[in-house]
């Protein structure tokens, strides 16, 4: 999967990720990056969590962007990253956003000991389904070992 977008290095400690990722989303929309990224595979927006120092309790990188078919043109100020195929366990956050996503992540963290996560990368996929008010849905994919 090839992604072009913007990123931030953050941590879940002391609520830092909530602020950093919220600021990243604000930047993504205020700079109208969806419209500026060429060669889009779709209009789905991905929030990818990668470069884990160890696990969800340690620093990691969040990238917000879109899947592209090629890296032939990467706009200034954006970055391109390619992610390998891996096995995922899918979770679906349902309800008002972003609260539903936050609640699902809490469930994932609470289940960490049994998920057998890879910590290579995980991602959320935002589509038209994620903009339906209290009936919104966001798919969350957690990388797991086979």
What feature does the model see in each segment?
Residues 1-146:
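A solvent-exposed interaction/effector surface
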């Amino acid at each position: 999967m090839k992604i072009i977008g913007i990123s931030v290095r953050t941590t879940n400690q002391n609520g830092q990720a909530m602020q950093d990722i919220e600021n990243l989303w604000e930047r993504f929309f205020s700079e109208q990056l969806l419209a500026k990224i060429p060669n889009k595979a779709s209009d789905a927006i991905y929030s990818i969590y990668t470069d884990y120092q160890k696990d969800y309790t340690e620093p990691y990188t969040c990238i917000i962007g879109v899947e592209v078919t090629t890296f032939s043109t990467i706009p200034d100020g954006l970055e391109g990253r390619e992610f390998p195929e891996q096995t995922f366990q899918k979770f679906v956050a349902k309800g008002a956003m972003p609260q539903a996503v936050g609640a699902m992540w809490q469930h994932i963290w609470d289940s960490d000991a049994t998920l057998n996560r890879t910590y290579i990368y995980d991602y959320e996929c935002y589509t038209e389904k994620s903009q339906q008010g209290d009936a919104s849905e966001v798919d969350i994919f957690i990388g797991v070992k086979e």
